[in-house]
A protein has these predicted regions:
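PRPP-associated nucleotide enzymes
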Residues: 1-293
């Protein structure tokens, strides 16, 4: 056991974890992963473990990752680690925040309790909170930090587009749209979305003269991409030629990214909370400022 903190990274998020360790000026080490043919995971950790460990791993495609984090933390505790910080830029299972149909598990609640039982601190970026407004009402541990990428996204927009109109596709996106617009004095508007299933949405935009504007669609995440795709198509039909998208979490399942680009969207900018070709905004400095060692 030694006392200098260590940052532990995983193969699927290695670049971002190494960048964070560099900014924190602490040692980086890999958690080695092996997946057996039957789907089970084996984890190998460094032999020498300090009293404080930062784990940097984003929780997209979460099911394997959650059990692997469970094994990792339990083994770290077994080796005498006293303080474990999770830096998870994308936090999974935040959307199921109520029992929508009788008998449904409220996964947000149970994942929150799992993380609270494992970690002394949890730090994330733009968690998808709707009915539950505060992250520390979900994850009740010693320290919980919910960061916003709004200023970083706003800076990217200002760098790439002159006099943009910022559009949020629905009420849930309003908090990010307002932050970005206020920081840079951008004009903005927010649409109204009706969800008809996992992959079906309808977005209605308020009346506005958008034809000659450069429009930036802003949302916290893109999963199926249907919200952004639907909105981009409407804007194209209204005669908008310059459409961009800026998002925090680029999940983009299946062919959704290609489908979004096929609507005529010129560029997609995302943070590196989830590894994706659209990543152009690093969260390392934002996370580093929030981690207290």
């Amino acid at each position: 056991m030694f006392h200098e903190p260590m940052l532990l990274g995983f193969p699927d998020y290695q670049l971002q974890a190494k960048n964070l360790a560099r900014l924190l000026k602490i040692e980086y080490a890999d958690a080695e992963l092996h997946h057996f043919p039957d789907g089970e995971s084996k984890i190998r950790l460094p032999v020498d473990i300090p009293s404080t460990v930062v784990i940097c791993r984003s929780l997209d495609s979460p099911n394997n990752k959650l059990i692997e984090l469970f094994f990792t933390v339990k083994e770290l505790r077994q080796k005498g680690c006293e303080h474990i910080i999770l830096a998870a830029p994308y936090l999974c299972y935040m959307r199921q925040d109520k029992e929508f149909q009788p008998g449904e598990a409220v996964s947000q609640r149970w994942v929150g309790r799992l993380l609270a039982s494992l970690f002394d601190e949890v730090i994330t970026v733009d968690p998808h909170l709707h009915r539950v407004k505060k992250l520390d009402d979900i994850i009740k541990t010693k320290r919980v930090v919910s960061l916003s990428a709004a200023s970083l996204i706003g800076n990217q927009i200002a760098l790439r587009v002159a006099d943009p109109l910022i559009i949020g596709p629905d009420e849930e996106s309003k908090q990010w749209v307002e932050q970005i617009a206020q920081l840079h004095q951008f004009n903005y508007l927010v649409g109204d979305k009706t969800r008809m299933g996992d992959r079906e949405v309808n977005v209605v935009l308020p009346p506005s003269d958008v034809k000659d504007r450069s429009v930036v669609l802003v949302d916290d995440m893109a999963s199926t991409g249907n919200t952004l795709i639907n909105t981009a198509r409407q804007l194209k039909n209204l005669g908008v030629n310059n459409i961009y998208c800026a998002i925090t979490h680029a999940l983009f399942v299946g062919e959704s990214y290609q489908e979004l680009l096929a609507t005529g969207v010129k560029e997609v900018w995302s943070t590196d909370s989830v590894s994706h070709p659209s990543n152009c905004i690093s969260l390392a400095s934002l996370l580093a400022e929030a981690i207290k060692l």
